[in-house]
């Protein structure tokens, strides 16, 4: 828009007070008193929600149906020799002692720690 053009305001534009930013109530809206609302609308909504089916319900039903069709596992699929540890023999008693020793070392570190005060940081 150039400075030479005239700007026309329609009725109502520009007639607002300077402090009014248009955030008031909408024109023509009416407040409805609470007495006019009936309590039945809430129960109708909750009844309607109970009648709806949700996809999660269908999934659970399919999983339950799938559990009934379990077949026996073939022993040919079981790996012999306990290769879950890739052949390494684990001494669980020794591993437990090692874990306890590591925990004891951590406790020593906690006892030596002294928290610095904020006042010490500002003075030093």
Curated annotation (Swiss-Prot):
Coiled-coil residue windows: none
Keywords, A to Z, come to:
Chaperone, Nucleus
Extent of Acidic residues compositional bias: 41-68, 102-124
Localization of this protein: Nucleus
The record, for InterPro entries, names: Histone_chaperone_domain_CHZ
Query: Does this entry carry the keyword Nucleus?
Result: yes
Pfam families given for it? Answer: CHZ
The protein's superkingdom reads: Eukaryota
Task: Spell out the residue ranges making up region: Disordered.
Answer: 1-124
- Which purpose does this protein serve, as stated in its record? Forms a chaperone-bound H2A.Z-H2B complex that acts as a source for SWR1 complex-dependent H2A to H2A.Z histone replacement in chromatin.
What quaternary arrangement does the UniProt entry report? Forms a heterotrimer with H2A.Z-H2B, stabilizing the association of the histone dimer. Also, with a lower affinity, forms a heterotrimer with H2A-H2B.
Q: What is this protein's record name?
A: Histone H2A.Z-specific chaperone CHZ1
